[in-house]
Structure formats: structure tokens, C-alpha cells
Regions:
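Vicinal oxygen chelate
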Residues: 27-42, 47-56, 104-197
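Acetyl-CoA-dependent GNAT
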Residues: 97-100, 167
Length: 197
């Protein structure tokens, strides 16, 4: 794979211009902060396409996301950035060290990312992810059955929270008397999950 030059300065400048414009519009808008709720709902086909993470060591992050979780490296920009994906997509996860090389994780009790979630297509695929984690001696922060899904919780080497999960078929989701989804949190039986492998 050939490393492509990455116009980092232009990219960052563009993001800053967008953020400044958005912040200015929000501060000087006559609309109330809840105006978004008065608009029509977002198109239901919209999906979150990728997450981009600041990491302290690009190689350490690639070792985790590609080596442990099994993502494919789709593009690398020297020692500063990389894209990884599943199934040939251009990228599901971006990794960069632009402002974070050798930096510690943010302290607890601050705002920022709580976790991002990676959706597996089947229970067997989630079980295989658990097997990979166990093989690499990666500790879990939690494992839950939410009724609609089964989930594993962990942190990457930079302290970013990750949820690995699969969704049960919609017709099996728990619902109340008014047919509203009724999620819960119960301990996930990891031995039972591993029986899928």
C-alpha cells in the first residue's frame, strides 16, 4: 500500500471555518435552542458513516484495530493518519496523531466521546470478536444484554470507549403495552455467547 500525501493544513482550516460559522450562527440566532425539534425528522436512511479518533501512537492503534479487531487498513498517510474498514468500505474508522502524538488520554470527568459502537451482523460474528479479544488479553469493561442487542464494552489503547454489539431481529425486541421499545441492561452470559464460535 502506498502512503498518499495528506493536505492536513487545508483539511484542518476547512473544519475550523465550518465550526466557527456554526458557532457564530448558534450564538447570534434568534431561534431558541430547541428549534431543531420543531423541524421534520431526519431521513431514516441516514447512517453514521465513520468515526475519526485522535491517538497517541498510530502503529499501536493499527495493531489494535487491525491486529485484534480485524479491520483492514485501507489508506495510510505516513506516521500521521490511517483509515481502516470492514468489507471494502473506504473507511469506518479514521486514526490520526495530528494533535495527539504521545499524548495521554483525556482525564476522567471531562466531556468528549463516551464510546462509539461497532455493529456486527450476527451473534456468531460478535462471539468471534470476543474470542479475538480474549486471545489478545484485552479486558472488557462490561458485557450486557439490552434486549434489543447483546454488547461488549472495552477501551482501545488510547482510552476511547468502544461497544461491540449485534442487534437481535426487530420482531424480537422487547416492547411495552404501547408497543414502545423497552430496553434493559442485564449481565451477558459470555460462555453462552462463545458457544456460537
Amino acid at each position: 500500500m502506498v502512503a498518499a500525501p495528506f493536505p492536513r493544513g487545508a483539511f484542518i482550516a476547512r473544519i475550523l471555518r465550518i465550526a466557527l460559522r456554526f458557532n457564530t450562527e448558534m450564538r447570534f440566532s434568534n431561534r431558541s435552542p430547541d428549534y431543531v425539534m420543531k423541524e421534520k425528522a431526519i431521513d431514516p436512511r441516514v447512517r453514521i458513516g465513520h468515526v475519526h479518533l485522535k491517538v497517541a501512537s498510530l502503529q499501536r492503534a493499527l495493531d489494535f484495530y487491525c491486529g485484534v479487531l480485524g479491520f483492514e487498513l485501507t489508506q495510510r498517510y505516513g506516521e500521521e493518519a490511517a483509515f481502516v474498514s470492514a468489507g471494502g468500505y473506504h473507511h469506518h474508522i479514521g486514526l490520526n496523531t495530528w494533535e495527539s502524538r504521545d499524548a495521554p488520554p483525556p482525564p476522567k470527568g471531562t466531556t468528549g466521546l463516551y464510546h462509539f459502537a461497532i455493529l456486527y451482523p450476527t451473534r456468531a460474528a460478535l462471539a468471534d470478536a470476543l474470542r479475538r479479544l480474549m486471545q489478545a488479553n484485552v479486558s472488557l469493561a462490561g458485557a450486557s444484554d439490552h434486549g434489543v442487542s447483546e454488547a461488549l464494552y472495552l477501551s482501545d489503547p488510547d482510552g476511547n470507549g468502544i461497544e461491540l454489539y449485534w442487534d437481535r431481529p426487530r420482531e424480537l425486541w422487547p416492547r411495552d403495552a404501547n408497543w414502545q421499545i423497552e430496553m434493559f441492561t442485564r449481565q451477558l452470559d459470555l460462555e453462552n455467547l462463545l458457544s456460537e464460535v
